[in-house]
């Protein structure tokens, strides 16, 4: 019987697949971390954990119709581990409960800073719901942090609000450990001189600023120029501790790479840090290596995940040639998202001090004491 051979097109596909498999296996066998691997410390705090809601249960949250019609919406629901129907039936607090439950099952991460997200503000200093894609009020996140001991309150205040300074003071009194901005979607220009009083109040209250820098593709619209790290020069000069989220990766400003602009600021300001959240995402390949090996970033990196995006296909050990096959399988088999994230970043060379820095910067707040004061005030009313 005459043997049957694959057709020419099929042979080409098989040869190409074989070559790719050989390259993949060879790269995995030769895999090396970006820097020497160090021990994983205890009590890690994730300083960059998002939450969202639909307004169910009186949370005050909302997602714009435009974003709800976008493909990203369903991805985010799945990554939070909830369905729209569940949220409508049980309330938005379900999302916070699920986050806390998953975090409690982590062997490596003990707490997370849960982030509120203010919206766009109009010319009168009020929330502009027509231009806001996602809104997560401080009251909702503060309540989640009071409800779950493994969640810390990350506030968000648009500095253009009429009562912005009072909102800062309220957040601090409720135990906020930082203020979160995403300037490209909140229409905030961090270099605006009108924000000087706001920055001075932040410095007075010892509230650090966690501000998005670099590419922003998580929403249906964004003004990328507002993510330029150079715009953070004003708050830095006024003594505000600033954490540049994502190391300004994957974006250019005025023809210059974001990380290059951030590195220049690092040399000038000792109160500037950068978090490593999202640096293992597919669209930021190579960014973690630069962060770990660039001398300007040494001693300035802070651990964060950008949860829930670590629960999406954007993050996978299979994208990296710097992990061995054994490491890839070990990470891939790990069920808890925080443990997966720590394991992958650890195996890629994230040092002990980076994992530990979040707890030193944000985990020292006596949250229990703050909660006791809040409950005592409520009882006295």
Regions found by a protein language model. Give the residues of each.
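Alpha-helical scaffolding within the catalytic cores
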Residues: 94-101, 137-139, 164, 226-232, ...
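Active-site gating/metal-coordination segments in enzymes
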Residues: 116-224, 288
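Catalytic metal-binding/acid-base residues of hydrolase active sites
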Residues: 48-52, 158, 184-185, 214-216, ...
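N-terminal Sec-pathway targeting helices
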Residues: 4-22
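Hydrophobic faces of well-ordered beta-strands that scaffold small-molecule active sites
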Residues: 45-49, 112-114, 152-155, 179-181, ...
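An N-terminally biased module of ancient metal coordination in phosphate/nucleic-acid-related enzymes
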Residues: 25-115, 121-132, 359-362, 369, ...
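H/E-rich (His + Asp/Glu) clusters that bind or coordinate divalent metals
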Residues: 3, 30-33, 241, 248-381
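Short, flexible/disordered intra-domain loops and linkers
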Residues: 61-63, 80-89, 121-133, 218-226, ...
């Amino acid at each position: 019987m005459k043997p049957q051979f694959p057709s020419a097109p099929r042979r080409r596909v098989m040869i190409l697949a074989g070559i790719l498999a050989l390259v993949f296996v060879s790269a995995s066998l030769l895999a090396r971390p970006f820097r020497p691997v160090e021990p994983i410390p205890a009590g890690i705090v994730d300083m960059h954990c998002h939450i969202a809601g639909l307004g169910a249960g009186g949370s005050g949250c909302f997602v714009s119709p435009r974003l709800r019609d976008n493909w990203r919406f369903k991805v985010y629901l799945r990554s939070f581990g909830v369905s729209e129907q569940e949220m409508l039936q049980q309330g938005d607090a379900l999302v916070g409960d699920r986050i806390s439950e998953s975090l409690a099952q982590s062997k490596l991460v003990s707490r997370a800073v849960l982030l509120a997200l203010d919206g766009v503000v109009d010319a009168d200093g009020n929330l502009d719901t027509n231009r806001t894609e996602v809104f997560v009020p401080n009251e909702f996140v503060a309540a989640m942090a009071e409800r779950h001991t493994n969640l810390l309150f990350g506030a968000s205040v648009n500095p253009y609000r009429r009562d912005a300074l009072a909102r800062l003071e309220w957040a601090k009194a409720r135990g906020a450990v930082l203020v979160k901005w995403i300037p490209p979607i909140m229409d905030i220009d961090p270099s605006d001189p009108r924000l000087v009083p706001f920055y001075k109040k932040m410095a007075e209250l010892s509230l650090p600023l966690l501000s998005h820098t670099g590419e922003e593709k998580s929403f249906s619209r964004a003004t990328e120029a507002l993510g330029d790290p150079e715009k953070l020069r004003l708050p830095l000069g006024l003594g505000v501790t600033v954490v540049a989220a994502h190391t300004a990766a994957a974006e250019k400003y005025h023809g210059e790479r974001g990380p290059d602009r951030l590195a220049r600021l690092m040399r000038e300001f000792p109160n500037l840090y950068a978090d490593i959240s999202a640096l293992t995402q597919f669209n930021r390949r190579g960014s973690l290596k630069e962060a770990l090996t660039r001398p300007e970033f040494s001693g300035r990196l802070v651990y964060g995940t950008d949860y829930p995006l670590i629960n999406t296909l954007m993050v996978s050990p299979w994208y990296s040639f710097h992990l061995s096959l054994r490491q890839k399988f070990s990470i891939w088999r790990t069920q808890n998202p925080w443990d997966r994230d720590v394991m992958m970043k650890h195996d890629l060379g994230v040092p002990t001090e980076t994992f530990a820095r979040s707890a030193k910067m944000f985990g020292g707040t006596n949250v229990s004491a703050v909660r006791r004061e809040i409950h005592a005030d409520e009882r006295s009313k």
